[in-house]
Amino acid sequence: MKRAVYAGSFDPVTNGHLWMIREAVELFDELIVAVGVNPDKHCTFSVDERVALLREVTSGFSKLRVDVFENQFLVNYAQSVGANYIVRGIRTASDYEYERTMRYINSDLHPDITTLFLLPPREYAEVSSTMVKGLIGPRGWEGVIRQYLPEPVYRKMLSMYSEQ
């Protein structure tokens, strides 16, 4: 069985993340979307909210499950869930440099786990959770962020930030 892990903070999940998930689901028998928890990182959404939003926007995928991992190398988590692949998105040259280094480290730790890089289409190449959150504030932000987020996430962002 070909099982893969696609990990991130998903704070919030974007249409770029969903593109990655759609592509990876087609490549593997099972995809585990793993929400990483970093206690040193301030997140907009709690881990429970991120998991719930991911489950909602991926409910149509039968070969997918959402999980959480904390305080361990991704490759060790992948090994613990029986995954033989790690899927990573490459949007920029700096993403590539970082992910290439991590791929070599992962290979040193678990040579049996392959890291696979996916390059998103142009319309998602600049989309990140950080970018979306950075657009919030100026008049009209609600219309601007809509194109980058799945509808349930967009509604959650509206309810969160419209109250402020």
Curated annotation (Swiss-Prot):
Its EC number is 2.7.7.3. It catalyses: (R)-4'-phosphopantetheine + ATP + H(+) = 3'-dephospho-CoA + diphosphate. It is an enzyme of class 2 (transferase). CDD domains: PPAT. It is found in: Cytoplasm. GO terms for cellular component: cytoplasm. Pathway: Cofactor biosynthesis; coenzyme A biosynthesis; CoA from (R)-pantothenate: step 4/5. Substrate binds at S9, K41, L74, R88. It holds the Pfam family CTP_transf_like. GO terms for biological process: coenzyme A biosynthetic process. ATP binds at S9, F10, H17, G89, I90, R91, E99, Y124, A125, E126, V127, S128, S129, T130. Belongs to the bacterial CoaD family. Homohexamer. NCBIfam families: coaD_prev_kdtB, cyt_tran_rel. Reversibly transfers an adenylyl group from ATP to 4'-phosphopantetheine, yielding dephospho-CoA (dPCoA) and pyrophosphate. This is Phosphopantetheine adenylyltransferase. It comes from Chromobacterium violaceum (strain ATCC 12472 / DSM 30191 / JCM 1249 / CCUG 213 / NBRC 12614 / NCIMB 9131 / NCTC 9757 / MK).
